[in-house]
From Swiss-Prot:
Domain of life, source organism: Eukaryota
GO cellular component, one term: cytoplasm
Family (UniProt): Belongs to the BAF family.
Protein name (record): Barrier-to-autointegration factor 1
Length: 89
């Protein structure tokens, strides 16, 4: 699977205090919607990923319902967080 530069940059280092828009698949529009819903930082969205027990289908559905994220972008975000978890947890 080919990944974007944004994906590689995110998974290549600790998350720290990065904005939610640093996650691959989450651009400015989705970032604003997520921020409005209380998910302004990457670690907050990562927390939701963990609360949903790293379940791909649940996380994608949640992103679609919460911020109107398309299935493709939601899968990209899931893959980004999932790979980060594999490397740092």
């Amino acid at each position: 699977m080919s990944t974007s530069v944004k994906h590689r940059e995110f998974v290549g280092e600790p998350m720290g205090d990065k904005e939610v828009t640093c996650i691959a698949g989450i651009g400015p529009t989705y970032g604003t919607k997520l921020t409005d819903a209380g998910f302004d930082k990457a670690y907050v969205l990562f927390g939701q990923y963990l609360l949903l027990k790293k379940d791909e289908d649940l996380f994608i559905e949640w992103l679609k319902e919460t911020a109107g994220v398309t299935a493709n972008h939601a899968k990209t975000a899931f893959n980004c967080l999932n790979e980060w978890a594999d490397q740092f947890m």
